[in-house]
Amino acid sequence: MAGNSILLAALSVLSACQQSYFAMQVGKARSKYKVTPPSVSGSPDFERIFRAQQNCVEFYPIFIITLWMAGWYFNQVFATCLGLVYIYSRHQYFWGYAEAAKKRVTGFRLSLGVLALLTVLGAVGILNSFLDEYLDIDIAKKLRHF
């Protein structure tokens, strides 16, 4: 069973490393801009880095859930490829935001697009599994007849 989801698991570890990296950047920014915990305001440069990291944390559960649902119920390889694009887009978002608030937009939009696609693929896969399991309707088989 574990071998069936190795790509999803590996990408999950990679994404957790990215989250840790972003958190470390906030720690470095705290030192650089002299913002001591629990304060979350101070230099605008610090605040942008902090907000970028917090936004990544806020979207992380959505990413993990949609990644695994699309991978389990639709296609693991395709979901993993989309997950790699998501990780890239979050990297672009984080460093764009750290530089200037307006530079975050491209990475943010790309990440939202990936999340939307993962959500749709997961929903389609779950619907197909439900129909096959409980109503004995195999959509993939029916589509091959066209």
From Swiss-Prot:
Its EC number is 2.5.1.18, 1.11.1.-, 4.4.1.20. InterPro entries: 5_LipOase_AP, MAPEG, MAPEG-like_dom_sf, Membr-assoc_MAPEG. The keyword Lipid metabolism applies. It comes from the Eukaryota. It catalyses: RX + glutathione = an S-substituted glutathione + a halide anion + H(+); 1-chloro-2,4-dinitrobenzene + glutathione = 2,4-dinitrophenyl-S-glutathione + chloride + H(+); leukotriene C4 = leukotriene A4 + glutathione; (5S)-hydroperoxy-(6E,8Z,11Z,14Z)-eicosatetraenoate + 2 glutathione = (5S)-hydroxy-(6E,8Z,11Z,14Z)-eicosatetraenoate + glutathione disulfide + H2O. GO terms for biological process: leukotriene biosynthetic process; lipid metabolic process. Keywords: Endoplasmic reticulum, Leukotriene biosynthesis, Lipid metabolism, Lyase, Membrane, Microsome, Oxidoreductase, Transferase, Transmembrane, Transmembrane helix. Each monomer binds on GSH molecule but only one subunit is catalytically active. One of its GO terms (molecular function) is glutathione transferase activity. GO terms for cellular component: endoplasmic reticulum; endoplasmic reticulum membrane; intracellular membrane-bounded organelle; nuclear envelope. It is a multi-pass membrane protein. The chain crosses the membrane at residues 6-26, 59-79, 111-131. It is found in: Endoplasmic reticulum membrane; Microsome membrane. Its main location: endoplasmic reticulum. Signal peptide: none annotated. The keyword Lipid metabolism applies. Homotrimer. Catalyzes several different glutathione-dependent reactions. Catalyzes the glutathione-dependent reduction of lipid hydroperoxides, such as 5-HPETE. Has glutathione transferase activity, toward xenobiotic electrophiles, such as 1-chloro-2, 4-dinitrobenzene (CDNB). Also catalyzes the conjugation of leukotriene A4 with reduced glutathione to form leukotriene C4 (LTC4). Involved in oxidative DNA damage induced by ER stress and anticancer agents by activating LTC4 biosynthetic machinery in nonimmune cells. PANTHER family: MICROSOMAL GLUTATHIONE S-TRANSFERASE, MICROSOMAL GLUTATHIONE S-TRANSFERASE 2. Belongs to the MAPEG family. This is Microsomal glutathione S-transferase 2. It comes from Bos taurus. The lineage of its organism: Eukaryota, Metazoa, Chordata, Craniata, Vertebrata. The gene is MGST2.
